């Protein structure tokens, strides 16, 4: 054990195990998660290849092998609970992306959300056992987030009771679905439904694409891999082109919308019900943002405690770089953000499950807010985490650029989350559309609930966006209640500014669509402020529920840092709205520096509480034992370029050149 890390852990003011229990949901969850992890670590069949030294084809093969072995092992161990499956995958796959992942994360959830009982009986078991390997084919070469623009067609033929699927243009070719290129034999395809001469918009169809047994593409199907990408090298993101490809009528998922044998269309109770899979995945991505940022913080903070560099006082030993205030200012707000996102991720998961249960009973009242909140928080958390992961890499100096640090892989694996499952700016605008509807309802005298209830204060003119918001007392920068109120006022103010600017453009005889575009920057700002308020509120609401006083104190410091750092970064919004004064902003910045000092003794213990195994981190710099330099040298020796003392290229190219000089 590195002596600096040993000292760091000894200096902590709390027991990290107690925070681990909170993050896992309970001590029992922690016990069970570790039990599952130990099954993997003690299994002789488990092998962990260093993906950094593999070709793309090798990475894909290893990932497929891992996926197949993982399914067999989960059956062997009797692991079927969704949360336990997630724990198993995280350690078993380590830092590999799973080619069969969309079978479990999108194909099966879509069957559950949109399939009839008969359809679930037909396809669920085979897909759970990987007889059917499914993917989710929505995105096309020419359209992604703009679902109404998708061009793939499914035309119903009542004579044969079949749908005829076509990719009518080059831009209509399905493009990007994970596992589509080489792995999947089925896809849930989103296509424009045409029956009796009318187009009824996007619907989901279960489409066999490869023959089971031979795995060859079926007639009418053209399918393959889209090529190398920024990351995800072991994932076979693919393309799919369909030419007059016929599937039975029963392959349309018909839990909500239906097509009768004669071609009659029966519309769903709500069009938004078909977006269930997207909402599910977006709610999951919030938690994934927390996980990825937590990994990067763990690596950067542990390494910063081990790395010694430069000097603070002359003639004294080189200090740990974690002692530099600038390093703390880079990393501790990100650590606070990781914790904030953990809590909001759990909140979103619980909210999704609760509302989904209500939807199953026919209550759709909370669906619009769920759709808006998952879209906005998906964008807010992934943007923030993406930038934070890169900040952690740079905080590791030159070694952070090496794949040995683990952070480059975390970054390239996470960064597509900013554009898949909904491009983030478009997601923010979807949230804004909901906020504008709520704003109109409030202005007409209706009281609203949920996370937008703060807009109920608008008619009383307590918030005056173009002038001064009435602030009854000075903001107490040590009061989480007061800081939450400040974020609430900022959100309300920016929502009202966007709404009034939108109305101004409409009153100038602009169409609603043109007015929306001309207001879109304000609308995104309003959505961002709303999401920021939700995160602050969820984090601060969590603290009173924590029993242990030492744990509560350290998490309170993180919550204060998260809230104050956000005010510092968005100071213009708070100043323009007269929510805080210039003098208070100076106090905020001073208090942030005080909090860095308070958090410093607990920094390593706070990342230890995430309880990542070294295998999951995949980092030489972030090792639990802190023995960085010895292992960095050993890691470098594994490079394929080191297999020979003299590379063959020397004899082929350099030696002939040198002999002529």
Curated annotation (Swiss-Prot):
Expressed in Schwann cells. Expressed (at protein level) in liver. Involved in the initial and rate-limiting step of peroxisomal beta-oxidation of straight-chain saturated and unsaturated very-long-chain fatty acids. Catalyzes the desaturation of fatty acyl-CoAs such as palmitoyl-CoA (hexadecanoyl-CoA) to 2-trans-enoyl-CoAs ((2E)-enoyl-CoAs) such as (2E)-hexadecenoyl-CoA, and donates electrons directly to molecular oxygen (O(2)), thereby producing hydrogen peroxide (H(2)O(2)). Homodimer. The enzyme contains three components A, B and C, the latter two being produced from the first by a proteolytic cleavage. Interacts with LONP2. Its cofactor is FAD. Coiled coil: none annotated. CDD domains: AXO. GO terms for cellular component: cytoplasm; peroxisomal matrix; peroxisomal membrane; peroxisome. Its EC number is 1.3.3.6. It is found in: Peroxisome. The modification Phosphoserine is found at residues 26, 649. InterPro entries: ACO, ACOX_C_alpha1, Acyl-CoA_ox_N, Acyl-CoA_Oxase/DH_mid-dom, Acyl-CoA_Oxase/DH_mid-dom_sf, Acyl-CoA_oxidase, Acyl-CoA_oxidase_C, AcylCo_DH-like_C. It catalyses: a 2,3-saturated acyl-CoA + O2 = a (2E)-enoyl-CoA + H2O2; hexadecanoyl-CoA + O2 = (2E)-hexadecenoyl-CoA + H2O2; hexadecanedioyl-CoA + O2 = (2E)-hexadecenedioyl-CoA + H2O2; tetracosanoyl-CoA + O2 = (2E)-tetracosenoyl-CoA + H2O2. This is Peroxisomal acyl-coenzyme A oxidase 1. The record marks 468-469 as: Cleavage. GO terms for biological process: alpha-linolenic acid metabolic process; fatty acid beta-oxidation using acyl-CoA oxidase; fatty acid catabolic process; fatty acid derivative biosynthetic process; fatty acid oxidation; generation of precursor metabolites and energy; hydrogen peroxide biosynthetic process; lipid metabolic process.
